[in-house]
């Protein structure tokens, strides 16, 4: 449980039943989202290192980013049309999916064709992430989905922002526009009805959620997506 909390996703169903390696103190899973963020982090640090004239640090960080970006292709399931987490004990890919599966786009690990499939088959799939309010923190057709139980369905602004940032790396104009519009609408719905900028949002009603602070700084990221998209 503690290891899953270190992901920042607390009670996400993605890690339910995943074995814990007591030797390495790690969950036995290769995670698309965390790997995508690691690559993104390495690229940002590499840029900073080059600007500061630290060429050795730049080479190391850029090399790490490229290594793991290429390795992420092993997590692509061509039948399913998405990058999937992989259990390291049996090597099987996990079909429990969340917005973090889109973070392969943040690492630029996907081809344009793969990115388009991810949008068509999953982002716009009403059984998974599409709907009046998006994006739920676990696919709507997951057995653990409840729409309002923290990371088991609730909508979180940082997830929307990270998916949007990933989309920016590809030619996905309609998906970017749709995500920005729905994010803005979700923010304004709560602000106009209650004057709230919430920690997270109910994935079916778009409003009240028992496990959510009424005011939380990252809720405003929903509006930031719209402002960036409309420049």
Annotate each PLM feature.
Residues 1-59, 90, 138-162, 168-169, ...:
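The feature captures the catalytic groove of carbohydrate-active enzymes
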